[in-house]
Amino acid sequence: MEELRGYLELDRSWQRDFLYTLILQEYIYSLAHDHGFNRTIFLENAGYEKKYSFLIVKRLITRMYQQNHLILSANDSNQNEFWGQKKNLYYQVISEGFAFIVEIPFSLQLLFSLEGKEIVKSRNLRSIHSIFPFLEDKFSHLNYVLDILIPHPVHLEILVQTIRYWTKDASSLHLLRFFLYEXRNWNSRISIKQYISFFSNRNQRLFLFLYNSHVCEYESIFIFLRNQPSHLRSTFSGAFLERIHFYEKMEHLVKVFTKNFQVILWFFKDTFMHYVRYQGKSFVASKGTSLLMIKWKYYLVNFWQCYFSVWSQPRRIYINQLSNHSLDFMGFLSSVRLNPSVVRIQMFEKSFIIDNAINTFDTLVPNIPMIGSFAKEKFCNIFGHPISKPVWADLSDSDIIDRFGRICRSLFHYYSGSSRKKSLYRIKYILRISCARTLARKHKSTVRTFLKRLGSEFLEEFFMEEEKVLSLILPRDSYTSQRFYRGRIWYLDIFCIHDLANHE
């Protein structure tokens, strides 16, 4: 970011919200392809100034609009030359640069807002597993939860209008419309779900930016409305970026609430409500009654329909009781369980036995979905019986063992916070036997013969790193070691869902 900031100091157009001029700058395309902002890219890739010169970029934009005219006038998409290999390059080159440009105002405003503030920079705060200690602390005291699937915008203009709140550059908005509509013009018969899948694969960076902007717009208004009736006004952090007329909109909303909706929204008052989201799935948990959750459910449906023009079916929001329902979240099955305990109290010559029950937040490994993921990747069949993986049979023995071992260790690392570790040993069993069968298939031998020949060295590849460290410090049968193996550990170096744990 400091690298980008240095370049933009020479070009003041971005400070007047003119993003369109940046797309004609050569360094933008170099930085767009160098996600780490490494200075050496200009030395290692000497051809960038030739490939992305001012004239070439300007010519590409002109040709894109000319080809777009052909799209609108052509009836047969098979005769459309824009989707040929040569014409497709125009869209790909410009869209990658544009995806980088639209992120600049938000990144720089965040950087400027943090200047002079002593904020601890910790990568652990980015870990997706940092949310589970929060859930353990808060959700164990709540009653109901709304399981919400955030709907996608049906009309593409909704995405453009969302970006319009953040920038004043009309030219950039026109170019954004072109990127969004060029695929829809190519084939208007595809559904919005098919188009989103197509667009996300074609330009993932731009798609993620637009989707996050859509979710940010929804959350900024939803959380503001939620804080009004509950009287729990949050302090705005510097990380929340300013939008056009945002504070004016807030003041207007406060006046509207005071005059018209204060009595109505009083029914939504709940001081024990918590909101959690990851990607397109979110939860709203509350200590209130089921009637309150039903009101929030239909309020959200109407909110999406009225503000975002999104038709959200009520079945996308489920009302569940935490005590008898499990939440499918980030590859875990989470639930609130009543954990009974017996306490003996001695008072002088008399003793009393008190039964005490404490709510605990359990996180379990979903066995059936995990077996489904393993079967999809050809580690086992649909019944969970390990099979060989023929596509790896051409690798060396050490590479095969290393691949299976890395998958096993990474899964144990990801599910280290599980309440019940025994279910993980089925995963280890599937991977170990699948590895042995793959090696036996390669050498045209039996699994039993191969396991005898490899011995303990083969098993060592399937131990977790922390198990290896503990085995050097503590005896395997010691009480401290056993408590460690059974305990829940959340590692704060995990930034995305494991591929095999993503069951969606």
UniProtKB/Swiss-Prot annotation:
The keyword Plastid applies. Belongs to the intron maturase 2 family. MatK subfamily. Keywords: Chloroplast, mRNA processing, Plastid, RNA-binding, tRNA processing. It is found in: Plastid, Chloroplast. The keyword Plastid applies. Coiled coil: none annotated. GO terms for cellular component: chloroplast. This is Maturase K. Usually encoded in the trnK tRNA gene intron. Probably assists in splicing its own and other chloroplast group II introns. It holds the Pfam family MatK_N. One of its GO terms (molecular function) is RNA binding.
